[in-house]
Amino acid sequence: MKNLSIFLFVVGLCMISDVYGKKSTITVKNELNPKNKNILKVHCKSKNNDIGVKYLKIGEVMSFSFKTNFWGTTEFWCNLYKGPDYKRYRGITAYQAIGLFAKDGSSYNWLARDDGIYFHKDSLPSYYKTYWL
């Protein structure tokens, strides 16, 4: 009986992890001034996943999707570097789950522009979030 209870508990956890929450998406777009021909260097990662370094030309987009973990502690950070010399940069928290029962399925959109970094969630209007260092 004890083994059956443990087995059912483990199967239940596996089922929850498969259906729990929806996939969220992080998108980063290079909207820098085309006259300057700046390439945007992007490096996103979490505690457990390194998405890798991407180089985005003007107008290009990178995106990736993920599920928030069961504990609601999922967090992704992105470092954005403004070309051509990549001396101007900014680190952002691109996504942060809030709470034990965090489940989302939203799209987190980051836009790199000459005057700073802009953000919008899903189809809401974008707004100025932070400046380049």
Curated annotation (Swiss-Prot):
Annotated GO biological process: rejection of self pollen
Top-level taxon in the UniProt lineage: Eukaryota
Compartments, record wording: Secreted
One cellular-component annotation, GO: extracellular region
Secreted among keywords: yes
Span of the signal peptide: 1-21
One Pfam short name: Self-incomp_S1
Keyword ATP-binding in record: no
Keywords, sorted A to Z: Secreted, Self-incompatibility, Signal
InterPro entries according to UniProt: Self-incomp_S1
Family membership noted in the UniProt record: Belongs to the plant self-incompatibility (S1) protein family.
Protein name (database record): S-protein homolog 21
Species this protein is from: Arabidopsis thaliana (Mouse-ear cress)
